[in-house]
Amino acid sequence: MEKGTPGFKAWDVHGKWSLRASVTSGLAFSDCEIPEENLLPNVVGLKGPLGCLNQARYGIGWGALGAAMACYDTALQYAKTRKQFANKPIASHQLVQEKLAWMITEIVKGQLLALHVGRLKDRGKVDFSHISMLKMNNVAIALETARKARDILGANGIVDDYCIMRHMNNLESVYTYEGTNDIHKLIIGEKITGISAFV
């Protein structure tokens, strides 16, 4: 679709609370006519344009882990240095250690999943359902890691001195774009049952 095509409109979206470092645009198509030379070659239906989603989803699976690690590292350092109750670091409390242990365990599991899917991809054996598992799992654990990190920091978890809320806001969008977790569950469900629930 070329700019200036009759019936095509695009506009910038302002006032975002998430993904603020990127430009987001709204798109509207009304009776647009696309010349034949602009059609994708050898493509039938949506499979061609949607094929790029696998690469994007794969990258998101890794990128979400970066946000999770930043939140975990922030929470760990904070917990080891923030002193409370008898001048002891809050890292000495059982519930704080439980949160930290959960975070690093889930992050490492996510890394192993991403590594496995990457190796399948390198060998040409990756399946779209593998990519859906990767995106769905890693974004969900990254978002939960951000929430647990925010809990550990208490009131400081919501201030811009720390990265947690920035990552949490962005992860809320990442949870939705390139396919919501519900869509990925349906993709995986179709793969394991052989029955499409998309009808």
Residue ranges, per PLM feature:
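Conserved catalytic-core motifs characterized by acidic clusters
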Residues: 13-16, 38-53, 77-93, 151, ...
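C-terminal helix-coil-helix/basic helical segment that borders enzyme active sites and/or dimer interfaces
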Residues: 79-80, 84, 88, 104-137, ...
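Alpha-helical scaffold segments that form or flank carboxylate-/histidine-based iron centers
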Residues: 91-102, 128-137, 165, 170
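Glycine-rich phosphate/cofactor-binding loops in nucleotide/flavin-utilizing enzymes
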Residues: 153-199
